[in-house]
UniProtKB/Swiss-Prot annotation:
Biological role: Catalyzes the hydrolysis of the adenine ring of phosphoribosyl-AMP.
Enzymatic reactions: 1-(5-phospho-beta-D-ribosyl)-5'-AMP + H2O = 1-(5-phospho-beta-D-ribosyl)-5-[(5-phospho-beta-D-ribosylamino)methylideneamino]imidazole-4-carboxamide
Family: Belongs to the PRA-CH family.
The protein, known as: Phosphoribosyl-AMP cyclohydrolase
Subunit structure: Homodimer.
UniProt key word Cytoplasm: yes
Cofactor: Mg(2+); Zn(2+)
Sequence positions that bind Zn(2+): 83, 100, 107
Gene: hisI
């Protein structure tokens, strides 16, 4: 995605939380928010260097190279930060069109209908077929 010099100024300009994390929103080329995750310094640096989204898995306590198991990589076109420098917005191309482990286009598929959450988006591929 980009060449980095030895300066860490661009990383230090961000507001990391107490655990060294920053929220990251992934938005596809149509403007749809497809995912929310966290990044640490290592995952953000790797994302910039390799051009594919790399997050920090808080549950697995390791780098999560999006698509490493499913093949549904996220090619990063640009990275922006908000006015406070405490949230990242990744403009991505979602390879395979599936961002969610449930087999949907977006992780934001549940919609509030009255007092219930209902799935508003279809499953594009059975997760059993994605994660063999």
């Amino acid at each position: 995605m980009a060449d980095l010099d030895n300066s860490q100024d661009w990383l230090e300009a961000l507001k990391w939380d107490a655990d060294g994390m920053i929220p990251a929103i992934a938005q596809d080329e149509n403007g749809r928010v497809v995912m929310f995750a966290y990044m640490n310094r290592d995952s953000l640096q790797e994302t910039v260097l390799c051009g594919n989204a790399v997050y920090w898995s808080r549950s697995r306590k390791r780098l999560w190279r999006k698509g490493e198991e499913s093949g549904h990589f996220q090619k990063v076109n640009s990275i922006r930060t908000d006015c406070d420098g405490d949230v990242l917005l990744l403009s991505i191309e979602q390879v395979g069109g599936i961002a969610c482990h449930t087999g949907r286009e977006s992780c934001f598929f549940n919609e509030l209908n009255g007092d219930r959450w209902i799935p508003a988006d279809p499953v594009l591929k059975d997760p059993k077929e994605i994660y063999k």
